[in-house]
Amino acid sequence: MPTINQLIRKRRKSSLARKKSPALQKCPQKRGVCLQVKTKTPKKPNSALRKVAWVRLSNGQEVIAYIGGEGHNLQEHSIVLIQGGRVKDLPGVRYHIVRGTLDCAAVKNRKQSRSRYGAKRPK
């Protein structure tokens, strides 16, 4: 344990909280280009093939982003918009691709939670 004099000479350093989505640089969304589109398997109790994309952002950083919804039209060189939001059972995936913007099409035949998947109101 430090003495009073040691604390006067050098203060205790307060630990900074880790940022949840540092690549966005305090922006709500960022644009990027898909480098590759693949599937990843989730952590232990779950089993699936989750669709993810490696994206190079407009600030030069590369991140892994999750493609939500059933089916997608993304491929290499697609321009996408990403936002923060991790996927709990995929380590390293801290961003989501916004559906229905830029090159990413909306989810077809979506009736509920449409705004999350860029789907228009059915007639």
From Swiss-Prot:
| CDD domains with a match to the protein in the record | Ribosomal_S12
The protein's UniProt keywords, in alphabetical order, are: Methylation, Ribonucleoprotein, Ribosomal protein, RNA-binding, rRNA-binding, tRNA-binding
Task: Please provide an example of a Pfam family that matches this protein in its UniProt record.
Answer: Ribosom_S12_S23
Q: Name one GO biological process term.
A: translation
GO terms (molecular function) for this protein are: rRNA binding; structural constituent of ribosome; tRNA binding
GO annotations of cellular component type: small ribosomal subunit
Note the superkingdom of the native organism: Bacteria
Matching entries from PROSITE patterns are given as: RIBOSOMAL_S12
The cross-references to HAMAP family, in alphabetical order and at most eight, read: Ribosomal_uS12_B (MF_00403_B)
Give the family this protein belongs to, as stated in its UniProt record. Answer: Belongs to the universal ribosomal protein uS12 family.
Report quaternary structure and partners. Part of the 30S ribosomal subunit. Contacts proteins S8 and S17. May interact with IF1 in the 30S initiation complex.
Record function comment: With S4 and S5 plays an important role in translational accuracy. Interacts with and stabilizes bases of the 16S rRNA that are involved in tRNA selection in the A site and with the mRNA backbone. Located at the interface of the 30S and 50S subunits, it traverses the body of the 30S subunit contacting proteins on the other side and probably holding the rRNA structure together. The combined cluster of proteins S8, S12 and S17 appears to hold together the shoulder and platform of the 30S subunit.
Name under which the protein is recorded: Small ribosomal subunit protein uS12
User: What is the originating organism of this protein?
Assistant: Chlamydia pneumoniae (Chlamydophila pneumoniae)
